[in-house]
């Protein structure tokens, strides 16, 4: 069943929701499609989640919660990601304390914020550090994962039914608490199940039960999934099965040869660490699916799992292996179909590449953790503009420098203002995101007969920071096409030029001096008649206006950006450190 359709629910599910979640269950947060985009609706209305995730220990006492929620509101957030910790919720086996989640919900309402709870249950950053002491001490009942050489890890084994039942029981109690405390207010709008699941030291668990599972036949549901999705499999998995990352005429027979009846994991996927990771991904996902089904049974809302990424060239076992990583999406979609979103935690370089890997037709983009820095704001703009993101969230939002907070506050204010237009145009191929730095400086967008050449603002010669050796802060923004020859350009540190396609093809490259004019001697060929005759029409800028966006999506004129501010009609520009929304109207001549 399509997961997004599933959220709307069947009659039976609606009945359950009414029983557990109150008479206003129809207003629960849910996911819905608009074109190629997936939007989250809260109270029946779509919204952009402008989030921040609290540091891990920021919600462990009432006083801190009161303080941090007020701070989050002041910093421009509309949604806060908050840990819900098993060890504090069930400090004694069978005895539950929801005073902290209760305070979170109350303070969120007081500050007009939405909440996404993060279930720190059996695993947090691979480790089982948030399990209660009674769980930790009873390793016979709640066994640990083991390395190849028999060393126990502080990682609960995904193959233990006792662990699953204890984890699921506590999670179930949390979901019931939320359903009773928040049945009609929609304060809690999404749940994260576990946190950055994965294996460390070894790529898989070598405990007795894990070994037995690895020696057994590959489960039938995975066999069926592979057969049904052959051409759509991720290149990583396809290569493991066929030897090629691309589907060829021989791929079907290669897969059939692997998927013989009763074939074990080693026979289908091999015996290296990458095969180990595939095995663990399936069983991690299968475990999570049991918690997801419990959440659906009690109070339906969007569910996601987050991934610590396999960056810096690390191999399985060196990063938290077998989590919801981009190259393992097939295992997670197969074994955890009730999970709506596989979400990346992006801390390392390559933000655009990671975002691109996770925005897929079957997986909307939600970024629950991103490094909190002075570039956070423009990265948020890029995610919403380029990938129709559901939400963006810097981690450790309760800390950070003044520059970090200025970046996110300014960008979130801009996104809130842009939201009527973004929510209207998402999924229709009418929005683009921009993100530039000192190495990645330019992007060319072809929109019908118009070519938009977009660059970092420091590519212009007259800002001394562009050439004095300073590190370039990232520049970024959003382009929204309102109509032919009619655009919104919003962001910080970007410049956009417009040309017809034929004009762009005939473009003469010129190096500009610090005054913005061509350097000496660059017009010689043109003056001597050496250049071919220009053909076709050109695009001109009719006007560039700075505008505000009204709540109904109409534009409110603020001021005209002409003369030096548009380089005499050559471009639309937003300098580094500025946050503006520009309305650009073009014409042809």
Spell out what each predicted region is:
Residues 49-60, 83-101, 148-169, 267-285, ...:
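The substrate-binding groove and active-site-proximal loops of carbohydrate-active enzymes
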Residues 381-504, 515-518:
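Aromatic- and carboxylate-lined catalytic core of secreted/periplasmic carbohydrate-active enzymes
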Residues 64-139, 284-298:
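Aromatic-lined substrate-binding rim segments of carbohydrate-active enzymes
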Residues 465-471, 486-589:
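C-terminal beta-sandwich/jelly-roll accessory domains of carbohydrate-active enzymes
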Residues 9-19:
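Bacterial N-terminal signal peptides
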Residues 143-329:
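Polysaccharide-binding and catalytic clefts of secreted carbohydrate-active enzymes
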Residues 288-301, 327-425:
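Catalytic-core region of carbohydrate-active enzymes that cleave or remodel glycosidic bonds
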